[in-house]
């Protein structure tokens, strides 16, 4: 089970814990992943994604799942998100 956001591509980062005496020990910075069902306005259907909390704020700012997916590049999206994006594009072209 990977720790990667399906919409933004944010993943685990590595770094150091630094003590007062400046000793450095390795650590991991884990993303704040949440399992969320996001509603598509054009498809009238909900989709489940594993998303970072910051991405949920971005979705609210942009105007929802449909607007975000259509404006996002395919490099950052997961395979399931790309499939949803294609379905939304096809649905908009039909109507």
From Swiss-Prot:
Protein name: Large ribosomal subunit protein bL28
Similarity comment: Belongs to the bacterial ribosomal protein bL28 family.
PANTHER family: 39S RIBOSOMAL PROTEIN L28, MITOCHONDRIAL, LARGE RIBOSOMAL SUBUNIT PROTEIN BL28M
InterPro entries named among the record's database cross-references: Ribosomal_bL28, Ribosomal_bL28/bL31-like_sf, Ribosomal_bL28_bact-type, Ribosomal_bL28_sf
Source taxon at top rank: Bacteria
Taxonomic path: Bacteria, Pseudomonadati, Pseudomonadota, Alphaproteobacteria, Rickettsiales
Keywords of this entry: Ribonucleoprotein, Ribosomal protein
A molecular function GO annotation: structural constituent of ribosome
GO BP terms, alphabetized: translation
Pfam families attached to this UniProt entry: Ribosomal_L28 (PF00830)
NCBIfam families: L28 (TIGR00009)
């Amino acid at each position: 089970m990977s720790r990667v956001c399906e919409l933004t591509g944010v993943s685990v980062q590595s770094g150091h814990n630094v003590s007062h005496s400046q000793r450095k020990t390795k650590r991991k910075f884990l993303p704040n992943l949440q399992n969320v069902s996001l509603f598509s306005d054009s498809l009238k259907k909900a989709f489940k994604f594993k998303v970072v909390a910051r991405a949920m704020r971005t979705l609210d700012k942009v105007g929802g799942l449909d607007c975000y997916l259509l404006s996002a590049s395919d490099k950052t999206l997961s395979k399931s998100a790309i499939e949803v994006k294609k379905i939304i594009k096809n649905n908009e072209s039909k109507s």
